[in-house]
UniProtKB/Swiss-Prot annotation:
Protein name (database record): GTP-binding protein 2
Domain of life of the source: Eukaryota
Induction behaviour: Up-regulated in thioglycolate-elicited mouse peritoneal macrophages.
Keyword GTP-binding: yes
GO biological process, one term: rescue of stalled ribosome
GO MF term list: alpha-aminoacyl-tRNA binding; GTP binding; GTPase activity; identical protein binding
Signal peptide (UniProt feature, chain positions): none
CDD domains from the UniProt entry: GTPBP1_like, GTPBP_II, GTPBP_III
tr-type G domain location: 170-398
Entry annotated with the keyword GTP-binding: yes
Organism in which the protein naturally occurs: Mus musculus
Record region (Disordered): 18-64
């Protein structure tokens, strides 16, 4: 990495630790024309001693798509130009699903020109007017001086523009929390969501536990959800200044929903279900500084990689260790992340600039893995994680979202409740389409392969009423007096026009990650596909008699209990004891309800 650019953004990056500048910042000697007459030629390392740098630093050229916009300056635009700028801002906000980043003082080809103080002030004033016009808020993320070939101080300014889309109450991001038992997952979430530091004995996590045995043992055994909000100015909104989840939702323009998963190996099936069913945008992998990579840490890391869930790492409990111990744990993580099969670029976050950069790099490149070192007791570096979460944009683009919303309604049933005076309530994620209050849907498959009609009475997101649910959003749906006994986890609620198909036999292309001996016909495994979790038997291995660790094959599975709703292309994960494998569904043998009753023995 060029030291000039590193100094420009105050970034700090460990050797081999990846980039530390904002928006893929890099230096180029030749490449593109420069309107300010920057010299061309071979790039040099370092600054000129005792003088200004001659080689201008660059960002990558501006992309037409995405939520990042470069502007050299925005000084006194004409009315026509202003309207064009407003339209452009709407486009960038749409691309970022409510968030956009403006780089002021940067040309379209990425050249960091910078602006004098008066021009920067005028440009930010225009940006404020643009934001007001579209109903957005702006926050200055950082300012840095650009001092090559100029005696006049020049700056570039990075600005976050945030606007909650008209069809949403707030921006939403789901983060699954992984890590070994006793690494501090629930404690960290308690500190973030309650606004109070831990006392070193687990006080912060008590409000997160759902069962008495969890409080007694201090270990999570079930999936729980916690929320952290940010207002339009980037300030944290949590239970320290809000009594209820409803108040947090009302005060926030962005919501982070943490999915707290179990760390103990005994509850691994619950952790896998949380990753496959709740469709997290990304995952937070917690590693204790004093134990390093231990227990289920590697297994959880492998799950995130297998399911292609982007993840970042938090090294906790740094207050318990010497600095050398923390550094050893970070080096251990960096070695694992760079190994074949992982191929990640670790980036150690040590400053607010690093946190801003990490959020942008993480969204743009799936290979970048930010690493935070913090303490839930002393609060050390906790603010850096909050900055990262505030700036982190949605990881799916607007086009993908629009395509999903154009499809027919499909809602995954992950949880089932009975609420007094409300009736049966189901919780889950809308995989595709749009769901409204009063919609008529069908739910299934039942044990005998049927789909039953029902009506959506009301919808809630984060305990707040919601009239419309869109693809990718998680919510609870009230079903009135629908019989709870007819429902189970793994079902789907779909539009009647979809004419859903079910199967008891399906084929998948798999990779056997580990098996002690040979994987043969007749072997039984627990299959996870989305919110489906059921025991299946291997009926056939195509073109082979057996499989060994690391081998690939197309395998035919048969569910043992009841038929399921599966789609071709869905990611698949199976396990039984130490046996593990991943793959995707390649074919489903559709059957009718009558055939299901015959084949499943009803």
């Amino acid at each position: 990495m060029d030291s000039r650019v590193s100094e420009l953004f105050g970034g700090c990056c460990r050797p081999g630790g990846g980039p530390a500048m904002g928006g893929n910042l890099k230096a180029r000697g030749a490449g593109g024309s420069s309107s300010c007459g920057g010299p061309k030629g071979k790039k040099k390392n370092g600054r000129n001693r005792g003088g200004k740098a001659n080689n201008p630093p660059y960002l990558p050229p501006e992309a037409e798509d995405g939520n990042i916009e470069y502007k050299l300056k925005l000084v006194n635009p004409s009315q026509y130009r202003f309207e064009h700028l407003v339209t452009q801002m709407k486009w960038r906000l749409q691309e970022g699903r409510g968030e956009a980043v403006y780089q002021i003082g940067v040309e379209d080809n990425g050249l960091l020109v910078g602006l004098a103080e008066e021009e920067m002030r005028a440009s930010l004033k225009t940006l404020h007017r643009m934001a007001e016009k579209v109903g957005a808020d702006i926050t200055v993320l950082r300012e840095r001086e650009v001092d090559y070939d100029s005696d006049v101080p020049r700056k570039i300014t990075e600005v976050l523009v945030r606007k909650v889309p008209d069809n949403q109450q707030f921006l939403d991001l789901r983060v699954a929390v992984l890590g070994n038992v006793d690494s501090g997952k629930s404690t960290l979430l308690g500190v973030l969501t309650q606004g109070e530091l831990d006392n070193g004995r687990g006080r912060a996590r008590l409000n997160l536990f759902r069962h008495l045995h969890e409080i007694q043992s201090g270990r999570t055994s079930s999936i729980s959800f916690e929320i952290l909000g940010f207002n339009s100015k980037g300030e944290v909104v949590n239970y320290s200044d809000s009594r209820t989840a409803e108040e947090i939702c009302e005060s926030s323009s962005k919501m982070i929903t943490f999915i707290d998963l179990a760390g103990h190996h005994k509850y691994l099936h619950t952790t896998i279900f949380g990753l496959t069913s709740y469709c997290p945008d990304c995952a937070l992998l917690l590693v204790s500084a004093n134990t390093g990579i231990a227990g289920t840490t590697r297994e959880h890391l492998g799950l995130a990689l297998a399911l292609k869930v982007p993840f970042f790492i938090v090294v906790s409990k740094v207050d318990l260790c010497a600095k050398t111990t923390v550094e050893r744990t970070v080096r251990q993580l960096e070695r694992v992340l760079k190994q074949p099969g992982c191929h990640k670029v670790p980036m150690l976050v040590t400053s607010e600039d690093d946190a801003v950069t990490a959020a942008q790099q993480f969204a743009q490149s799936p290979n970048v893995t930010p690493i935070f070192t913090l303490s839930s007791v002393s609060g050390e570096s906790l603010d850096l994680l909050k900055v990262f979460l505030n700036i982190l944009p949605p990881l799916t683009n607007s086009k993908e979202q629009e395509e999903l919303m154009q499809q027919l309604t499909e809602f995954q049933v992950d949880e089932i409740y009975t609420v007094p005076e409300v009736g049966t309530v189901v919780g889950g994620t809308l995989s595709s389409g749009i769901c409204r209050e009063g919609d008529q849907l069908v739910v299934g498959p039942t044990d005998d392969g049927c789909f039953l009609e029902l009506r959506v009475c009301s919808i809630q997101r984060n305990r707040s009423a919601c009239r419309v649910l869109r693809a990718g959003q998680a919510a609870t749906l009230a079903l009135g007096d629908f019989d709870r006994a007819l429902l189970r986890k793994g079902m789907v609620m779909v539009s009647p026009e979809m004419n859903p198909t079910i199967c008891s036999v399906f084929e998948a292309e798999i990779v056997l990650l580990f098996h002690a001996t040979t994987f043969r016909r007749g072997f039984q495994v627990t299959v996870h596909v989305g919110n489906v979790r059921q025991t299946a038997v291997v009926e056939k291995i195509h073109a082979k008699d057996k499989l060994r660790t690391g081998e690939k094959a197309v395998v035919r599975f048969r569910f043992l209990k009841h038929p399921e709703y599966l789609k071709v292309g869905a990611k698949l994960l199976f396990r039984e004891g130490v046996t593990k494998g991943i793959g995707h569904v390649t074919d489903v043998q559709a059957i009718t309800a009558g055939e299901a009753q015959a084949t499943m023995g009803f």
